[in-house]
Amino acid sequence: MKALHFGAGNIGRGFIGKLLADAQAELTFADVNQTVLDLLNSRKSYQVHVVGEQARVEQVNNVSAVNSGSEEAVALIAEADIVTTAVGPQILAKIAGTIAKGLSKRHQQGNSQPLNIIACENMVRGTSQLKQHVFDVLPQEDQAWALQHVGFVDSAVDRIVPPAEAGSSDPLEVTVETFSEWIVDQTQFKGQPPAIAGMELTDNLMAFVERKLFTLNTGHAITAYLGQQAGLQTIRDAILDPKIRQVVKGAMEESGAVLIKRYGFDAAKHAAYIDKILSRFENPYLHDDVERVGRQPLRKLSAGDRLIKPLLGTLEYGLPHANLIQGIAAAMSYRSEQDPQAKELVELLAKLGPKAALAQISGLPAESEVVEQAVAVYNAMQK
């Protein structure tokens, strides 16, 4: 199995790339970081530190790397069996051109073997969005062929991969938690889905996408925002604070009530899933900074993301949402000199006031009760 993975960052190396390599794929990473590309090509291997109860170091071997925009990447797409990404939602549009060129070349070369493309991003149906970007630039004469031979497979991914410790001098070394989950939509494959240990197939992907978004992502973000408000440094420090933990767990229970109503999840199993996530946040071996986890507050406060989407579900089903409101107010309070969206958030709040700013960012009606509630909590937080 030939695999090309876009994104040689921590998630690419520590999660998706590792699973592909473990499945004996002939794996090439595509990235723009020349230092990482050169090191991967000279060493052909790297180490993954899995931390938790059963800490271990695992070696990933037989890897190579190319520049994301290069002709080599295009040529690899023409030959690959699977293409995956972990580049971040904003970058999908930037790699679409390379993928489109690769598909055109594949068509020209008469390669009618099925190719499956899987975007492994923190977003809902990311591969469907990547497909749209690819088809925007794919020549007309290749489109019908691509629809027939190329599967764009949506997925849900979950593994906490914090940035490397400052003390590590090796740019390729990566630290990951023991837990990982990669769930793919089996209805979207062309040909047989590849056998990759750790990749689970489902025909009800949205249930798992929303379960992860409404629980892990919602909880992680609220922990970060409340942690920053309390002057705490890491996710672990924040979740060990009883007041913060109460709100975070409460918010995950509120969003969980939506999931149980919408998808029929078992209530006891979902409660256990929430407890599992709380214990992941407590992992003493993961030094996950609240400022990093809180980054991009405008995206995280948008209508389809981890704070507003579960809130909309509570409104749809007439369910409580007091803790989600606390999380939204804390997100409005997020500040970071390093994050352009945090600066833009401050400007919007100053220019429009909290009510109009939240309405603009989230799509919620400015006069709605939930906006009034969130603004009241936000104002109280500023005192």
Swiss-Prot record:
Annotated positions binding NAD(+): A3, L4, H5, F6, G7, A8, G9, N10, I11, G12, R13, G14
Keyword Acetylation carried by entry: no
CC annotations in GO: cytosol
InterPro entries xref list: 6-PGluconate_DH-like_C_sf, 6PGD_dom2, Mannitol_1_phos_5_DH, Mannitol_DH, Mannitol_DH_C, Mannitol_DH_CS, Mannitol_DH_N, NAD(P)-bd_dom_sf
GO BP: mannitol catabolic process
Gene Ontology MF terms: mannitol-1-phosphate 5-dehydrogenase activity
EC numbers on record: 1.1.1.17
Enzyme class at the top of the EC tree: oxidoreductase
Pfam families assigned to the protein according to its UniProt record, in alphabetical order: Mannitol_dh, Mannitol_dh_C
Catalytic activity: D-mannitol 1-phosphate + NAD(+) = beta-D-fructose 6-phosphate + NADH + H(+)
Family affiliation: Belongs to the mannitol dehydrogenase family.
Entry protein name: Mannitol-1-phosphate 5-dehydrogenase
Organism of provenance: Serratia proteamaculans (strain 568)
